[in-house]
Amino acid sequence: MKKGSKLILILLVTFFACLLIFPTLKWYFLMSVEDKKISSYSQEALRDYSKKKALNDLVKLKELYNKDPNSSIPASLSYLIPIAKNNYRSSMKIPPNIFTAKTLREGFLTDSDMGEVSLEIYRYYENIKKGKSRIIHLGLDLSGGMSVTISLDYSSVEKKLGRSLTFAEREDAIYRIMQILKDRVBRFGLTEPKIVREAGGNKIFLDIPGEKDESRVSTLLSGKGNLTFYVVDDESTSLLHRKILEAGSLFSIPEIQASMNLPDSKQIFPWYVKDSYGVDDESSVRYYVVDASPENSFDGAHIKDAGVSNDPRTGRDTVAFSLDVDGSEKFFKFTQKNVGKSLAVVMEGKIKSVAGIGYAITGGNVSIQGDSFDKKEAQDLALVFKTAAFPVDIKIDDLRIIGPTLGARTIDLGIKASALALCLVFLFICVYYGLSGVVAGFSLVIYNVFLILAILSAFNFTLTLTSIAGLILTMGMAVDINIVIYERIKEEIREGRRFENAFEAGFKKAFLSIMDANITTFIAVLFLTLLGTGVIQGFAWSLSVGIVASLFSSLIFSRFILEFIISVRKSKFISISWSSKYAKSN
């Protein structure tokens, strides 16, 4: 490869590596602890925080205006300026070039303006949360938290079906359980977890950083879910709506329910409209009375699968789901008895959808067509059907709590050990190989580590003590690459070749040996990556990425630097040993 091509390749790789590693650097070194904490809130908690902060900041702006209308805008309120500019333009006004308390205050005159501020705050933290999918995370041994190993038990389902589950059915069950766990973790407001499955196995590993309450996690994992179909009591629902109107804005559902003298079998559930934050809007809710008696309800645990389809006759999106054999028969009797009535889909005490029963449904294939379904709403409802209940039984095989003190201690020791190892490697190669060693040390200890961390960031890698060990081992292997190259160059010099020729021949003849050794190691590591679990997989991942980065750093980057140094030196020579024999040109 020509020097120009090498330079272009190095610049491209470095540019993309900078893009990949920036989110990690931003998260750990540029972002405040407060922002990190807030970004881990659940959607509901983040919405409430955004509204509260928007209100407080607008109050601060008003106080600033009352104190001195011409005062400058503090940094904490500077995020309001772009919103104010949009408000000026929406009012057909020209925004000022420089904002003061007076001009900024004039950009927020209506209640809807506060909503815009709240949304801007919400989007800011949502973007931080999304950015976490592109950073290197600290494992539980470094950050502390809880580690849970979950195994799947297919026996009860297979006994019920009278046959063994197919490979596709098992894979679907694992996928659905992982989706359920993600959904439940978000509802419980826990820190974003790491949920991975055992390669080729029936285990799921759930790591929750910072969590120490065993009872909360046990509650999260307990139960199969409670998606239920209820028949709507239209007469009682109409009465409920009238009483809500009579009571006005300060109505109380428990008081209204008591005044209606409803029997125990009749229950009231809310149906929330999603707000602009994508969460339930407390101010936009409609209540329904349902008949919760066993004969007028259907257990959603019978749902096998769900998806979104399009009705060719109406062009509307529909949510279709299929039932197991037992559920098909029960659902037929259930719908046959209630033709012409409304059906409410209830999960976690909230109505997810209401649809009419047009006819008795046979065959276990059901479709729901809402009057105002859009694609997103249909997909959300399908996900509710798929993830409401664990499709198979689960059990906790192992639950471990790692304290933050241990995490802090292991971080400190890990950083010290890594730094010491890198310094010793750098010192050795510099002393033994002279200026060539300095170039190799820079390319391996600095550029190589930079590439490895950039690649691991792209894969949302979780850094553990074992993966750190893999990185240190990678440094040693990278040094081996340069040792092979330099020793080969020295052999060529001993055979009487000029340095320029020995340099080219050394790299060329060492190439095959280097590739053979690293490809062999990479194949072994690849199997550990695919088949290993937990700490073994983390070690294998860091080692495999390190091999690729080390080859590029040694064969492309360090060679280009050496060639550049040689080209600008009059002697056309560079030291490759502490020995005077190789310290001057032939």
Swiss-Prot record:
Keyword terms of this UniProt record: Cell inner membrane, Cell membrane, Membrane, Protein transport, Translocation, Transmembrane, Transmembrane helix, Transport
GO cellular component: plasma membrane
UniProt subcellular location: Cell inner membrane
Sequence intervals crossing the membrane: 7-27, 418-438, 439-459, 465-485, 521-541, 546-566
Biological process according to GO: intracellular protein transmembrane transport; protein targeting; protein transport by the Sec complex
InterPro entries: Acrflvin-R, MMPL_dom, SecD, SecD/SecF_arch_bac, SecD_1st, SecD_SecF_C_bact, SecDF_P1_head
Protein's UniProt keywords contain Transmembrane: yes
Superkingdom field: Bacteria
Membrane topology qualifier: Multi-pass membrane protein
Record GO terms (molecular function): protein-transporting ATPase activity
Sequence similarity: Belongs to the SecD/SecF family. SecD subfamily.
Role description: Part of the Sec protein translocase complex. Interacts with the SecYEG preprotein conducting channel. SecDF uses the proton motive force (PMF) to complete protein translocation after the ATP-dependent function of SecA.
Known partners and oligomeric status: Forms a complex with SecF. Part of the essential Sec protein translocation apparatus which comprises SecA, SecYEG and auxiliary proteins SecDF. Other proteins may also be involved.
Protein name per the record: Protein translocase subunit SecD
Organism: Borreliella burgdorferi (strain ATCC 35210 / DSM 4680 / CIP 102532 / B31)
